């Protein structure tokens, strides 16, 4: 189980990313449209002044049940060992173990 503080920090990053999403996207479009380098630097400075945690690359996918940040399956939102336990217990409908 992940620490509550780490899960809370991740939720805070998600809120910041949603808040600054439109601002970051519009300023990136402006950079591509502006021909002069000095104007690009000004817009880039505006991007740099936004909070560091508002960048989408700072987000991690976490396991829904344990909060584990590694080995997550996007389709289920679970980490590998929890996914395996749930499939063995038949708690995930439609998931089957492969055998050949």
From Swiss-Prot:
The keyword Transit peptide does not apply. Keywords: Chloroplast, Plastid, Ribonucleoprotein, Ribosomal protein, RNA-binding, rRNA-binding. Gene3D superfamilies: 1.10.287.1480. One of its GO terms (cellular component) is small ribosomal subunit. It comes from the Eukaryota. Belongs to the universal ribosomal protein uS14 family. Part of the 30S ribosomal subunit. NCBIfam families: PRK08881.1. This is Small ribosomal subunit protein uS14c. It comes from Carica papaya. The lineage of its organism: Eukaryota, Viridiplantae, Streptophyta, Embryophyta, Tracheophyta. The gene is rps14.
């Amino acid at each position: 189980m992940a620490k509550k503080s780490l899960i809370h920090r991740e939720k805070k990053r998600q809120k910041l990313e949603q808040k600054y999403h439109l601002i970051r996207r519009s300023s990136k479009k402006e950079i591509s449209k502006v021909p002069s380098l000095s104007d690009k630097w000004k817009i880039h400075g505006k991007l740099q002044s936004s909070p560091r945690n508002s960048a989408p690359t700072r987000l991690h996918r976490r396991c829904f049940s344990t909060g584990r940040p590694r080995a997550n399956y996007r389709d289920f939102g679970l980490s590998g060992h929890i996914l395996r336990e749930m499939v063995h217990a038949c708690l995930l409908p439609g998931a089957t173990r492969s055998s050949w």
